[in-house]
Swiss-Prot record:
Protein name: Translation initiation factor IF-2
Chain ranges of the tr-type G domain: 390-559
Highest taxon of the lineage: Bacteria
Residue segments, region G3: 445-448
Gene this chain is encoded by: infB
UniProt key word Transferase: no
Known role: One of the essential components for the initiation of protein synthesis. Protects formylmethionyl-tRNA from spontaneous hydrolysis and promotes its binding to the 30S ribosomal subunits. Also involved in the hydrolysis of GTP during the formation of the 70S ribosomal complex.
Annotated region described as G5, given as residue ranges: 535-537
Stored InterPro entries: DNA-bd_dom_put_sf (IPR009061), EF-G-like_DII (IPR053905), IF2_assoc_dom_bac (IPR013575), IF2_II (IPR044145), IF2_N (IPR006847), P-loop_NTPase (IPR027417), Small_GTP-bd (IPR005225), T_Tr_GTP-bd_dom (IPR000795)
Length: 891
C-alpha cells in the first residue's frame, strides 16, 4: 500500500473524514482534511482498532425518538402549538470479570452485616429481659418490648437503605469499565458509614443495661433533618417546574423517589419515631397559565416629556402620555373641548391638555429642518463683509392681447419671436436679457390673453419695473385694466409704452385720459409715470424706452450679492421626453453653477446642465440672468423659489416634508359637510350632463391657465366640467386608459400622443383633441358644453279670450263661446284656463270654430267657439290663455 489522502482513506474505510480524524487523534496522530496517511500510520490505526474491537462489541446502544405537540397558552387567549422531539439514548455494557467479583464481595458483606445485626438484636433482647425481670414489673416490660420493636423496625429500615445504595451503584457500575474502581471506593465508603451507624446503635443498645432511658444518635437526627429539608426543596422545585411546563409534570418528577422517613424525637421515656411524609402538590388545584402578566400600580405620578408638533391626533397624544384615549377625551371635556379619538387638534390645545395631566411639553417646529437648511448658506446680506454690486433690472412687459408686446420685445432684441409663435400670441412667460450701451436689461414677456391672469400676477411679483404696452389705435382694454391692478397690488414702478403710434387712427391723448382715470398720471400732467411713444414696426422711440427703463432702475438702486450660493425663481417648467423636467429660472442673487444641489418647492436635485435663452450650454449664471436647467426630480410650479443647499440628503427630507404638507393642505381644503353642501349635492345628483376632460399641455403655466379657464365654463349646474387630470408632457398610455375608464375627452395643448397611446386611441375610438392656440381650445369646449345642455323653452303668449257663455256639443262636450280680447287664437296650441287669476287647467285647444266653420285662427275682437281637449269644467267668465313653446339659445 502507498500513501493516500485522508479523503480517499476515509472512503476506503467507509466512514466520514471527521470520524477518521477522530480515530487518529485517539492514537496521538493529528490529521487535517487535506493531510496524507502513510503506511505506518495505517498499521498503527488498524492495531488500535482491533484492540478496542472487543470493547465496542460489548456495548449495545438503543436510540428512540418521540415526537409530540405541546399546546402553550399565550397572552391573547390563543394556544400556540409547539412541536417537541424527545430523543433517548440507552447504552448497555456487558459486565467484566472485575465487576463480577465486586458484586460477589458486596453481596457477601451485606450477608455478614445482616447476621451481625441479627445476633446483636438477640443478645440485646436477652440482656434487657434479664435486667428488667429483676427490677421492673409486667407493665414496664410491655413498654420496653414496644420500644425494642421500634428499634427492630429502625434496623430493618437501615437494611433497606443499604440495599438501595447497593442497587444504585450496581446500575452505575455497568456504564464503563474505567469507572469500576471508583465505584468500588464509593460503595465501600457508603457501606462503612452505614455499618458504623449500625454498630453505634448496637453499642448503644449494649449499654442500655446501665441506663434505663434510650437516646437517639445525633448523626441519625441530623440525617433525618437533612432528608426532610431536601424533600421540601424538591417539592418547591416541583411546583416551579409545573408552572414552567404549563401545569404539566414530567415523568421524571412523577416517578421521583418519595421515601417514607421516620422523624426521631426524644421524650422522657426515650426515643420515639413518627412517620414523616413529604408535602405533595395539590393536584386538584386549577392549572395556572404559563404566561401571566402582572401590573403593579405606580406608587407615584409618572411625569413624561411630551414632544408635540404643529398638529397631533387625540390617539397619538394619548399614546405619547401612555394612557388611554378615553382619559384624554375626558380631560378635554373638562376643559370645555369636545373631540373624538381620531380628531386632529392644534399645538396649543395639545399643550394645554398635556400640562393639565401633569406632563412636561416640548414644542417641536416641524419646519425646523427646513429653516436649518435655508439658513445654512454662505450668503448673509446683513453681514458687513458681504459685498453688494449692481444688477440688471428685471422688466416685465404687460398689456392687452395683440397690443404688440412681443413685437416690441423683438424690436429691442432684433429677433423675430412673434412671427414664430403659434397664432401670433404669447402663451407662456419668456425671459430674455438684452445688453445696451448703458447696461443690461432682463425682459419678461407675459401673455395678454384673459386666461393667463395667474401668469401676469407672477410676472409682476418677480419684476422690478413694468412696461405697460397700450395700442394707440385700440385704447385701454380689459387686460390693460387688469395689469394696472396687478401693478398697484405689487407696488411696482411702471413705464407706459404707447405702441403703434405710426398708425393713422392713433390717439395718444385719449389713452392718457383713460389711464389717468385708473391712477396713472403722466409726468407732463404733474404725475410720476413716464409715457413713451414707440413703434415696434419702425423702431421709433425704442431708445427712449430703454433710457426710461435704465433711469428708473438707477432710482431703485438694485444691488445684490454676485458670489456664493444662488437663489432663483421658477418662471416656467415643462417636461421634455428626452431630457426630463426642464425648468426656466431667473437668478435673483449669487451664482448658479452646474453641479449645485438645489431645492425647489416639493422637488430637489442636482444641476446637470444649463442653457441660456438662445439654447447655448453655459456653466454658470449670475443675478438677473434667465437660464434653463436640468436635473430636478420633477416639474415644479411656476413661481417657486429655487435655493442652492449644501446637503442633498437634507434637501430630499425637506422636499418629502413639503409634499406631505401639500397633501394635508389639499385634504384640509375639502369642505366639511353642512346643510348648504348637502342641498347642493342633492341638486347635482339630478344633473346628467357632465363633461370629463383630461388636459395635457407643454408647460406648467399653460396647464394652470387652461384648467382655470375650463372650470369657469361650467354653466352653473346644467353641465359640469370635471377635469380628471391636468399635467404636462405628451399623451401616454396611462392617460388613454383613464379616458377610456371615465368616458373623458383628452385635450392636448401643444402636445401629441405617443405610438402606444395612439394605437389604443384608434382601437377604442376615443375622443382626442389637439390645439395650439388657447382661443380655439376654449371656444370648442364652450360649444361642446352648449351642445350637451338640455334645450330650454319659454312660454310666449299669443292670444287671450274671455268665456261669455258655455254650450253643449254632442261631439266635443262643453264648448266655450269666447270673445278674443288680445292677440290671436290658434288651433292646436297649448292653452291655460284661468279663473280668478288662478290657473285651473293647462291643456290643448282641440276645436276652434267661427259660427259653424272650423278655422285655424281667430283674431282680436272676433267671437269664436273653443273646445278644450279632455276638460269639461269650464265656466262663464273664465279666461283662456293661448301660448306657444319657443326654444331659447344658451348664453
Amino acid at each position: 500500500m502507498t500513501d493516500t489522502t485522508i479523503q480517499s482513506f476515509a472512503a476506503e474505510m467507509k466512514m466520514s473524514v471527521d470520524q477518521l480524524i477522530q480515530w487518529f487523534s485517539y492514537i496521538g496522530i493529528l490529521k487535517t482534511e487535506i493531510g496524507i496517511v502513510t503506511q505506518r500510520e495505517k498499521e498503527i490505526l488498524f492495531k488500535y482498532m482491533n484492540d478496542n474491537k472487543s470493547d465496542i462489541s460489548k456495548k449495545l446502544i438503543l436510540q428512540r425518538k418521540t415526537r409530540s405537540i405541546l399546546s402553550v397558552s399565550s397572552v391573547g387567549g390563543k394556544n400556540k402549538k409547539v412541536q417537541i422531539e424527545i430523543r433517548k439514548k440507552l447504552t448497555y455494557v456487558q459486565s467484566t470479570l472485575q465487576e463480577t467479583e465486586f458484586i460477589d464481595v458486596k453481596n457477601k458483606m451485606v450477608l455478614d452485616a445482616n447476621r451481625e445485626a441479627s445476633s446483636l438484636i438477640v443478645r440485646n433482647n436477652r440482656l434487657v429481659n434479664k435486667k428488667i425481670s429483676n427490677t421492673l414489673g409486667p407493665s414496664s416490660l410491655t413498654k420496653i418490648s414496644k420500644k425494642n420493636h421500634r428499634y427492630s423496625e429502625l434496623i430493618e429500615h437501615k437494611e433497606k437503605v443499604i440495599g438501595k445504595i447497593s442497587r444504585k451503584f450496581e446500575d452505575k457500575s455497568l456504564q464503563d469499565s474505567d469507572e469500576t474502581q471508583l465505584l468500588k471506593k464509593k460503595t465501600k465508603n457508603c457501606w462503612d458509614i452505614e455499618l458504623n451507624n449500625t454498630n453505634a446503635i448496637s453499642s448503644n443498645l449494649g449499654d442500655s443495661s446501665s441506663n434505663s432511658k434510650l437516646y437517639c444518635m445525633p448523626e441519625l437526627l441530623e440525617k433525618n433533618n437533612n432528608q426532610k429539608l431536601e424533600n421540601e426543596r424538591r417539592n418547591r422545585s416541583r411546583v416551579r417546574t409545573r408552572y414552567r411546563n404549563g401545569g404539566k409534570l414530567t415523568k421524571q418528577h412523577k416517578r421521583g423517589n418519595h421515601h417514607r422517613l421516620y422523624e426521631a424525637t426524644s421524650d422522657e421515656f426515650g426515643m420515639e419515631e413518627e412517620l414523616y411524609i413529604p408535602n405533595r402538590v395539590n393536584k386538584s388545584k386549577r392549572k395556572q397559565s404559563a404566561l401571566v402578566q402582572v401590573f403593579n400600580k405606580p406608587v407615584q405620578t409618572i411625569t413624561r416629556d411630551i414632544i408635540i408638533g404643529q398638529t397631533i391626533s387625540v390617539a397619538e397624544l394619548a399614546n405619547k402620555m401612555s394612557i388611554k384615549s378615553s382619559r384624554v377625551i375626558k380631560t378635554m371635556m373638562q376643559l370645555g373641548i369636545i373631540a373624538t379619538i381620531n380628531q386632529i387638534i392644534d399645538q396649543d390645545t395639545a399643550q394645554l391638555v398635556a400640562e393639565e395631566m401633569g406632563h412636561n411639553v416640548i414644542l417641536r417646529r416641524e419646519n425646523e429642518l427646513e429653516e436649518l437648511i435655508m439658513n445654512d448658506r454662505d450668503i448673509d446680506i446683513t453681514s458687513s463683509d458681504t459685498t453688494l454690486a449692481n444688477r440688471a433690472p428685471i422688466v416685465t412687459i404687460m398689456g392687452h392681447v395683440d397690443h404688440g408686446k412681443t413685437s416690441l420685445l423683438d424690436r429691442i432684441r432684433s429677433t423675430k419671436i412673434a412671427s414664430s409663435e403659434v397664432g401670433g400670441i404669447t402663451q407662456s412667460i419668456g425671459a430674455y436679457h438684452v445688453s445696451t450701451d448703458n447696461g443690461m436689461i432682463t425682459f419678461l414677456d407675459t401673455p395678454g390673453h384673459a386666461a393667463f391672469t395667474a401668469m401676469r400676477a407672477r410676472g409682476v411679483q418677480i419684476t422690478d419695473i413694468v412696461v405697460l404696452v397700450v395700442a394707440a389705435d385700440d385704447g385701454v382694454m380689459p387686460q390693460t385694466i387688469e395689469a394696472i391692478e396687478h401693478i398697484k397690488a405689487a407696488n411696482v414702478p411702471v413705464v407706459v409704452a404707447i405702441n403703434k403710434i405710426d398708425k393713422s387712427e392713433a390717439n395718444p391723448e385719449r389713452i392718457k385720459n383713460d389711464l389717468n382715470n385708473h391712477g396713472l398720471i403722466p409726468e407732463e400732467w404733474g404725475g410720476d409715470t413716464q409715457f413713451i411713444h414707440v413703434s415696434a414696426t419702425s423702431g421709433n422711440g425704442i431708445d427712449n424706452l430703454l433710457d426710461a427703463i435704465l433711469l428708473q432702475s438707477d432710482m431703485l438702486e438694485l444691488k445684490v450679492v454676485h458670489h456664493g450660493m444662488a437663489r432663483a425663481i421658477v418662471i416656467e417648467s415643462f417636461l421634455d421626453k428626452g431630457r426630463g423636467p426642464v425648468v426656466a429660472v431667473l437668478v435673483r442673487e449669487g451664482t448658479l453653477k452646474c453641479g449645485d444641489i438645489i431645492l425647489c418647492g416639493t422637488e430637489y436635485g442636482r444641476v446637470r446642465a444649463m442653457r441660456n435663452e438662445f439654447g447655448h450650454e453655459i456653466t454658470s449664471a449670475g443675478p438677473s440672468i434667465p437660464v434653463e436647467l436640468l436635473g430636478l426630480s420633477g416639474s415644479p410650479a411656476s413661481g417657486e423659489s429655487v435655493i442652492v443647499v449644501r446637503n442633498e440628503k437634507k434637501a430630499r427630507e425637506v422636499a418629502l416634508y413639503r409634499q406631505g404638507k401639500s397633501r394635508e393642505i389639499k385634504l384640509a381644503r375639502q369642505k366639511e359637510p353642512n346643510i348648504e353642501n348637502i342641498f347642493s349635492s342633492i341638486k347635482n345628483t339630478s344633473v346628467v350632463s357632465e363633461l370629463n376632460l383630461i388636459v395635457k399641455s407643454d408647460t406648467k403655466g399653460s396647464s394652470e391657465a387652461i384648467r382655470e379657464s375650463l372650470e369657469n365654463l361650467s354653466t352653473g349646474g346644467d353641465v359640469t366640467i370635471k377635469i380628471l387630470s391636468s399635467s404636462i408632457g405628451g399623451i401616454t398610455e396611462t392617460d388613454v386608459a383613464l379616458a377610456a375608464a371615465s368616458n373623458a375627452v383628452i385635450v392636448g395643448f401643444n402636445v401629441r400622443a405617443d405610438p402606444t397611446a395612439r394605437r389604443i386611441i384608434e382601437a377604442d375610438q376615443l375622443d382626442v383633441r389637439y390645439y395650439s392656440v388657447i382661443y380655439d381650445l376654449i371656444d370648442e369646449v364652450k360649444q361642446a358644453v352648449h351642445g350637451m345642455l338640455a334645450p330650454r323653452y319659454k312660454h310666449e303668449i299669443i292670444g287671450l279670450a274671455k268665456v261669455r257663455n258655455v254650450f253643449r256639443s254632442p261631439k266635443y262636450g262643453n264648448v266655450a263661446g269666447c270673445m278674443v280680447v288680445e292677440g290671436m287664437i290658434k288651433r292646436y296650441k297649448k292653452i291655460r284656463v284661468i279663473r280668478d287669476n288662478i290657473v285651473v287647467h293647462e291643456g290643448e285647444l282641440e276645436s276652434l270654430r267661427r259660427f259653424k266653420d272650423d278655422v285655424n285662427e281667430v283674431r282680436s275682437g272676433i267671437e269664436c267657439g273653443i273646445g278644450i281637449k279632455n276638460y269639461k269644467n269650464i265656466h262663464s267668465g273664465d279666461m283662456i290663455e293661448v301660448f306657444d313653446m319657443v326654444k331659447i339659445s344658451h348664453v
